[in-house]
Amino acid sequence: MEESSRILVVGGTGYIGRRIVKASIALGHPTFILFRKEVVSDVEKVEMLLSFKKNGAKLLEASFDDHESLVDAVKQVDVVISAVAGNHMRHHILQQLKLVEAIKEAGNIKRFVPSEFGMDPGLMDHAMAPGNIVFIDKIKVREAIEAAAIPHTYISANIFAGYLVGGLAQLGRVMPPSDKVFLYGDGNVKAVWIDEEDVGIYTIKAIDDPRTLNKTVYIRPPLNVLSQKEVVEKWEKLSRKSLDKIYMSVEDFLAGMEGQSYGEKIGISHFYQMFYKGDLYNFEIGPNGVEASQLYPGVKYTTVDSYMERYL
């Protein structure tokens, strides 16, 4: 029986990284977590690392500013998964260029998964500013990976449920509104809503699969392909409460960017791409992509209906 690939997770204490670590351990992979010495100032992250260590993970100290430490860490594994923070923290995404250089020098990595996990940056050249900068930077990382001929898989995980399902996709809310809900446009644009735990499972499933080599894996479980209005209706049915619906035109929505911080403007522009332009589901998956729930039908993914029950 072939041994399971050894996996190094970079950003393993982050929002999605911790789910990837958990899935890697659960699926029987020797799991390594990269950590920086500065982590000692964050007690919660230290506790998380120690919890993962107790469950079998190995901790490797390294730094993006120490090339040799990165190379040494990479040489101990077969697969590298980066889950460094993105969005408005631009320098984190571009720091992956240092990781690419380490992987290139080590020469032993069978698969690299860079930090993406949202909309496919390869399809977002039309994105509006300032949200487009996230996709531009992720493309720079892709270009470096491909120029170095590093075997890779890109993961497009769409909407993280923890951010938007509970709040019914209301800006700044993570819990269900009690009286009214804003619908973007007519509320009928399709999106894809994914439990973060499932992102971890599908990511780990993909790293040894020849069908995902040098391809983009789109996580599109069919029961979770829903419009915002459909998500709202599911909550109303589950909670047995009707909400007043306020339909927001694209002009009114974009006017809300004025006076916001840079990070908030990025978030608003991404909402525009998802709920007005439909950029999560307005395209067919091409020959360079595959769909996760079709590849792994045995994974029992969490439906939006099931996910919502925690908010009752």
Swiss-Prot record:
GO biological process, alphabetically ordered: lignan biosynthetic process
EC number: 1.23.1.2, 1.23.1.1
A GO term, aspect molecular function: lariciresinol reductase activity
Protein origin, superkingdom: Eukaryota
Keywords of this entry: NADP, Oxidoreductase
InterPro entries: NAD(P)-bd_dom_sf, NmrA-like, NmrA-type/Isoflavone_red_sf, PCBER-like
Function field: Reductase involved in lignan biosynthesis. Catalyzes the enantioselective sequential conversion of (+)-pinoresinol into (+)-lariciresinol and of (+)-lariciresinol into (-)-secoisolariciresinol. Abstracts the 4R-hydride from the NADPH cofactor during catalysis.
Protein name (record): Bifunctional pinoresinol-lariciresinol reductase
Annotated source species: Thuja plicata
Upper lineage: Eukaryota, Viridiplantae, Streptophyta, Embryophyta, Tracheophyta
